[in-house]
Amino acid sequence: MQFSKDMVAAFARPAILCLLRQGESYGYEIIQKVKELSNGEIQWTDGMLYPILHRLEEEELIQSRWGESETGRKRKYYSLTKHSTPAIDQYRMQWTTLNEFLAPLWATQKP
């Protein structure tokens, strides 16, 4: 399924933060988790993900460190900061409100 840029921009930030709540991760792993959790319906690219990771890091919602993979390759690992919990809570409230607004509209929509 193709998502518009606006839709991706709206849900990518809270999705990344929620995924990082499960523990630190690197870019390719985040892309794979999104694909897996969406049963392949959502497929992010490096070009979409990394600018968002950089913005989240600039806003101090995430932090990064360089590490090595099991094969010795360098990877940049991302994790949450102390500032991320309030942001996640705010995103949750916003998405809940939007869902509560849209759910009855979807239900009453005529074909």
For the regions a language model picked out, list residue spans one by one.
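N-terminal helix-turn-helix DNA-binding core of bacterial DNA-binding proteins
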Residues: 3-48
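Short, solvent-exposed loop/turn elements at beta->coil junctions and helix N-caps
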Residues: 4, 67-68
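Short, hydrophobic-biased segments on the C-terminal half of alpha helices
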Residues: 50-55
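Glycine-centered, phosphate/nucleic-acid-interacting loop/turn motifs that mediate DNA/RNA or nucleotide
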Residues: 60
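Short beta-strand "wing" residues that participate in macromolecule-binding interfaces
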Residues: 64
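Basic, amphipathic "hinge/linker" alpha-helix immediately C-terminal to the N-terminal HTH DNA-binding motif
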Residues: 70-92
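Amphipathic alpha-helical dimerization/coiled-coil segments
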Residues: 86-111
